[in-house]
């Protein structure tokens, strides 16, 4: 034994020594990498709805962005950066994939999800050993839209949201706190962190002291607040001594029109105020400020990061690696033609806006096309289409060429159908969830020009915003005026029906629902609302027929199957109701409310052929498991099921737990029901026990 120990000692000593030396060498190399300014980490910060000209480092008249300014003073600043679309989801898809909307097929918020055939920057960096994380500040970038591809952690769940839990966004301060925690956790790994700040998006309500300091320009105040929050993250990088080894990129998805050209906010037009964004690269090891005036795009971020990290870019990337600009001299590059679009106006039945931007010039294709000399006319006030037809034709040909090379057919599976909560989330952010945009890129000279509908768009958008504020009477007055102008715009009929349903005016909702379906048939949500209204009016059979149409149009909609089942229960068609509940659970077995309802049916039905106490207990227990035995309603049902099977002790114990939880949650009505149920159990149990003892 002793000889073996002596023999093993040298090898163990060598192993320990090797580990120690390896650790020292690794630390030395890491420290050396820091000192030499090599890129170890990547931090990409996107400020939603941020015009480039509102940053003080881009020349804004007031000091809005001191933290970004300090970073920019030692960074490469691009002064002419074009977003391919002034809409949050598609713009971020372009930012992370390096491709334009015709290729990645995302043209609007909440209508599409990013196909897995696309390759994101997060996927590329994860494949190269980076820890990948994202902190998202608005529902519009929720992972259900496919943009979370490649992220190890994608924080899009809002524990606290703006304005009393009613707005599907989080403030920048909370975003920064989550980011700081993430950095602390991953400080010893090489990482890619994507941060999304939503604060400059309307409504403009910056917190103090920014609200007072920028009382005359609240949009600028929101940008100043976002800068303050970004500063907290940059300070954390310094504290962790990661600032010298982290590539920091600050940009935006799009700008904001602020009333220019008649548009209140963004999404509709593609003028420079909406599509010109900041882009700043702070590269480790480089401290000299440099401004690049060349026209570049948001799609250049992904290939530039790949170029700096010596990672091959996927062949489908349409952006260009800008790292050649980061040296002492500027490279000679070919002339760029940057694509930009808004298909948003097509929802009103008018033409799209498709544009191309090159150094100093911009062409917009629509019913009345536009050409602007951006060098002399940055506000795009003078349309030169008639004065310079040859230049317009050249740019039109370039636009046609871009589309021919990039447009891909959309996979129907990548279209999104939103549930009611998702629609409310979007409305809370000021977005209109309704008609799909037209993405066929067909141009029809006979269609109206989007410019002619901007006031209609602004008013309609304000009306949908008032819905979230529950100013229903005002919404109805606006809709009636808009209907006088465009009586065949089905979304107005849908909105009038929605308001009537919210006010429980079911009879008033019916004509708008029927007219909406007449104008645009085959929409399952409208059939669903019609079914609800008919059910509330006591027209159960008609209601069920409408619900069946919903299932034909959306066969995987479990909520509709559950609602059909409830209508059948009202008609006392218990067996048919059970069939619908079962079909719903076959599609999604993780529905505690549906399991709970079925358990109650099997435990209490008067039909002896359907009564099944064993199944009732099984379903009720499953509902309790899915809610961690913390929901009083499911425990109450489990108690009822146990009692129906004669398991009175278990029934009493579950009822006691349910009562305690209901009292804690202040669910007084439910607590009273449970208390009566418990009293009846306690009254029955002694009689049963005495009956057993007499035997």
Describe each PLM feature range.
Residues 456, 490-491, 524-525, 558-559, ...:
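Helix-start (N-cap) detector for alpha-helical repeat units in TPR-like alpha-solenoids
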């Amino acid at each position: 034994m002793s000889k073996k120990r002596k023999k093993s000692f040298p090898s163990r000593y060598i192993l320990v020594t090797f580990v120690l030396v390896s650790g020292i060498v690794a630390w030395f190399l890491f420290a050396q990498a820091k000192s030499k300014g090599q890129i170890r980490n990547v931090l990409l910060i996107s400020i939603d709805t941020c015009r480039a000209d509102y940053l003080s480092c881009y020349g804004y008249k007031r000091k809005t962005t001191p933290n970004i300014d300090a970073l920019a003073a030692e960074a490469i600043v691009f002064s002419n950066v074009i977003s391919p679309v002034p809409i949050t989801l598609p713009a971020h898809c372009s930012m992370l994939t390096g491709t334009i909307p015709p290729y990645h097929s995302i043209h609007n918020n909440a209508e599409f999800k990013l196909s897995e055939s696309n390759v994101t920057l997060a996927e590329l960096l994860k494949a190269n050993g980076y820890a990948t994380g994202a902190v998202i500040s608005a529902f519009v970038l929720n992972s259900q839209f496919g943009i979370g591809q490649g992220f190890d952690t994608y924080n899009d769940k809002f524990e606290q949201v703006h304005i009393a839990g009613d707005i599907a966004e989080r403030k920048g301060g909370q975003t920064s706190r989550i980011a700081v925690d993430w950095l602390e956790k991953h400080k010893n790994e090489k990482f890619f962190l994507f941060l999304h700040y939503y604060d400059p998006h309307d409504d403009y309500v910056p917190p103090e002291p920014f609200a007072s300091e920028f009382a005359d320009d609240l949009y600028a105040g929101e940008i100043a607040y976002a800068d303050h929050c970004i500063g907290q993250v940059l300070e954390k990088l310094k504290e962790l001594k990661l600032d010298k080894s982290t590539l920091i990129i600050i940009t935006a998805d799009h700008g904001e029109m602020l009333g220019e050209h008649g548009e209140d906010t963004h999404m509709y037009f593609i003028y420079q105020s909406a599509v010109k964004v900041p882009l700043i690269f702070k590269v480790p090891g480089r401290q000299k400020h440099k401004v690049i005036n060349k026209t570049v795009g948001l799609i250049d971020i992904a290939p530039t990061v790949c170029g700096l990290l010596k990672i091959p870019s996927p062949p489908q990337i349409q952006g260009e690696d800008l790292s050649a600009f980061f040296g002492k001299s500027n490279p000679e590059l070919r002339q760029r033609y940057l694509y930009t679009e808004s298909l948003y106006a097509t929802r009103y039945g008018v033409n799209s806006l498709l544009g191309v931007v090159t150094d100093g010039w911009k062409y917009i294709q629509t019913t009345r096309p536009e050409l602007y000399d951006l060098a002399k006319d940055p506000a795009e006030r003078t349309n030169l289409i008639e004065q310079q037809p040859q230049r317009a034709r050249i740019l039109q040909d370039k636009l046609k060429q871009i589309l021919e090379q990039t447009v891909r057919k959309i996979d129907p599976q990548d279209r999104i159908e939103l549930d009611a909560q998702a629609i409310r989330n979007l409305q809370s952010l000021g977005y209109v969830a309704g008609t799909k945009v037209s993405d066929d890129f067909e141009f029809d000279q006979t269609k109206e020009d989007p410019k002619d509908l901007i006031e209609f768009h602004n008013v309609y958008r304000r009306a949908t915003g008032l819905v979230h504020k529950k100013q229903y009477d005002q919404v109805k007055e606006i809709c009636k005026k808009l209907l006088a102008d465009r009586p065949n715009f089905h979304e107005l009929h849908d909105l009038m029906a929605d308001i009537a349903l919210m006010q429980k005016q079911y009879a008033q909702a019916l004509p708008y629902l029927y007219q909406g379906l007449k104008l645009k048939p085959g929409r399952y949500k409208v059939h669903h609302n019609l079914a609800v209204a008919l059910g509330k009016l006591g027209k159960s059979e008609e209601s069920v027929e409408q619900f069946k149409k919903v299932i034909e149009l959306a066969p995987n909609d479990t909520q509709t199957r559950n609602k059909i089942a409830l209508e059948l229960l009202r008609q006392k068609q218990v067996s048919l109701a059970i069939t619908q509940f079962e079909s719903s659970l076959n599609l999604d077995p993780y529905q505690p409310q549906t399991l709970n309802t079925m358990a109650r049916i099997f435990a209490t039905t008067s039909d002896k052929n359907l009564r099944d106490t064993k199944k009732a207990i099984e379903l009720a227990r499953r509902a309790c498991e899915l809610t961690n035995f913390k929901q009083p309603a499911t425990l109450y049902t489990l108690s009822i099921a146990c009692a129906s099977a004669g398991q009175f002790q278990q029934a009493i114990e579950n009822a006691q737990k349910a009562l305690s939880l209901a009292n804690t949650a202040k669910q007084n009505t439910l607590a009273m029901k449970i208390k009566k149920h418990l009293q009846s159990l306690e009254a029955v149990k002694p009689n049963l026990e005495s009956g057993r003892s007499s035997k």
